[in-house]
Each structure stands twice: as structure tokens, then as C-alpha cells.
Amino acid sequence: NDSMRFRKNIERIGEIMAYELSKTLDYKNIDVQTPLGIKHTTTIAEPVVLCSILRAGLALHQGFMSFFDNAENGFVSAYRHHYDNDDKFEILVEYQAAPSFEGKNLILIDPMLATGQSLVAVLHKLHLEQKPKEIHIAVVIATPEGIEYLEKNVPSNCHLWVAALDEKLNEHNYIVPGLGDAGDLAYGIKL
């Protein structure tokens, strides 16, 4: 397992996704004073908030930060809590540290979209009182089942960005062929 190489590759994917996503945002005209004159240019109209699912989303988040260098940042922990060696699980969202995203572009970052339940649970936790202008969900690998679940359970101002679409979920709700636990691959196996 080469954790650094995995992180760097996920980070690169984040940079590419951030660039492509940036083309869909609204821009406004600004004037920038240079030593020799004024340059008329554009900048993103509404601020960007990057919000990552801990810990798996950190490398992808870093790629987005390289592109959206003025973005505010938020972090949420979400994980599957399995019951007694059963395939049944619930999504627990326990930690949240995020700035206000009222009227801003919220980019929710998680490398894996398996069932979609984690992302929906995080959106419900974040979205209770504040209304972002647009919500963008950025994932590296998704399944058709996860995409379908999101389409049925997210607000209409939500846009999904996927780098690769895998075949399906298996009977344990893991991505097939997938790549394993993104957090473990990036940062080492957890207890």
C-alpha cells in the first residue's frame, strides 16, 4: 500500500474536478489595479465552501483547495455503523465544523458514492437552517444505485460530479469492483 501515491492521485482528481466544476459557477466583473493600469476581469460571484467527509475526503478536499484557494472549509464525520456482523447498517453523522453557507456554493466532497446514504445524511445535517445557492457533490467513484438514491433524496439545486462509474453494489453494499476503503488507502488502516 503506497498511501502517499494514492493521496496524490486523489488530490490530482480533485484539482481536475474543481476546474471543470468552476466552469459552471456564476461570475461577476471586477477591476484589478495593477502597477501599470486597471485590468477588467471576472471572479466567482458567490463564495465557495468546501465541505469534506472525514477522513476519506481529505485528499480530494486538498485538490479542490488547490483550485479554490479562497474557499471556506468545513468538515463532517459520517460512517456506517454495522449491527452484529449483519449487512444492515445506519449512517452516523457525529462531528460537524462548517462555516455559514447561506447563499454560497457548497461543494460536498467524498471520494466514494456507494449507497448514497452517507451523503444524504450529511446534507440533512448541514442543510437544516442554511440554504446554499448551489450544492455540488464531488465523488471519485460512484455506483448506479448511489446515483439513483441521490436523485430521489437531494434538493433540486444539487449537482453531482463523478470521475468514474463502477458497476454496482454487492450484497454488503460495497462498490464493485471499487478500490477498497479510501480512508484506509490514504491514511492507513484504522482500528
Model-derived features with residue positions:
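PRPP-associated nucleotide enzymes
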Residues: 1-191
